[in-house]
Amino acid sequence: MSLQKCQEEWSEIEKEFQQLQETHKVYKQKLEELNSLQNLCSSCINKHKRRLTEFKGNLHGLKRTSNLEEKELVQQIDGTIKERRNAFFDMEAYLPKKNGLYLNLVLGNVNVTLLSTQAKFAYKDEYEKFKLYLTIILLLGAITCRFVLNYRVTDEVFNFLLVWYYCTLTIRESILISNGSRIKGWWVSHHYVSTFLSGVMLTWPDGLMYQIFRNQFLAFSIFQSCVQFLQYYYQSGCLYRLRALGERNHLDLTVEGFQSWMWRGLTFLLPFLFFGHFWQLYNAITLFGLSRHDACKEWQVFVLALTFLLLFLGNFLTTLKVVHTKFQKNKLKKP
């Protein structure tokens, strides 16, 4: 290449760089405008929320002294206020917000809000794939530990994988909640409890008590992974159909339990879920019995018994509540 050609090419590169600088300058300006607009929206939403709260208090004061026609109007306005809160929730999903305590402890004060619907859905889809792949890996790990490798080291690797899996799920779910996912209640707390349980299992030293409970725990892990795989497979298909019909949010997630939207074609999962819940109770009873054994010296036995009992109560009562609510609604629909 001649020097003249090099100079010509360098001139073109210089022009490209100047254009790039101009484009980046415009980008920074737009970014500042976006930040200002985000702050304005957040401020307006908070102001409107306060006004609605004050208005609702005044509205309930009028309700006590109003006649029948006025009460109907008050109820109508009250229903609109509830819908407005759902609208605020959707708006705030696209605005930066302060992280909760857990995300602050893990990530610090980092903005985790994804600005586009496409980015939110992609992150949610990646979360679902992560759950599926790790469920399969945990299933294979539990089968290997139960039937092939009877070593404490391999058990520790399996338990460490469980701790890492549930820790990662809690972080990802917290990010999804910050971005507008409506997963809440016990199905969020459930993973924190499972993280704690897996951590205690990891610290349980090898001994007579551990060996007595080992096979029962691994068999439970195999069953639980199989049920979770079934849930993912059928729930993801059901959610896809409901989203296509506009009946579910695009950030709704598959869960390890049973929710009201699953009545359409997923009731066959209920026997498996209840069996798994009662297996958790059986684990708790077994561990309570072991904790009273003369040879039991480990604190992990009693703590694990309490944790399995907590998981049983949370899972069983939450599932039972969903089933009971559905039956009550069906009764009201009947003439």
UniProtKB/Swiss-Prot annotation:
It is a multi-pass membrane protein. Its main location: nucleus. Keywords: Coiled coil, Membrane, Nucleus, Transmembrane, Transmembrane helix. Residues 1-40 form a coiled coil. It is found in: Nucleus inner membrane. The chain crosses the membrane at residues 100-122, 130-150, 157-177, 193-213, 268-288, 300-320. InterPro entries: TMEM120A/B. It comes from the Eukaryota. One of its GO terms (cellular component) is nuclear inner membrane. GO terms for biological process: fat cell differentiation. Necessary for efficient adipogenesis. Does not show ion channel activity. PANTHER family: TRANSMEMBRANE PROTEIN 120B (PTHR21433:SF2), TRANSMEMBRANE PROTEIN INDUCED BY TUMOR NECROSIS FACTOR ALPHA (PTHR21433). Belongs to the TMEM120 family. This is Transmembrane protein 120B-A. It comes from Xenopus laevis. The lineage of its organism: Eukaryota, Metazoa, Chordata, Craniata, Vertebrata. The gene is tmem120b-a.
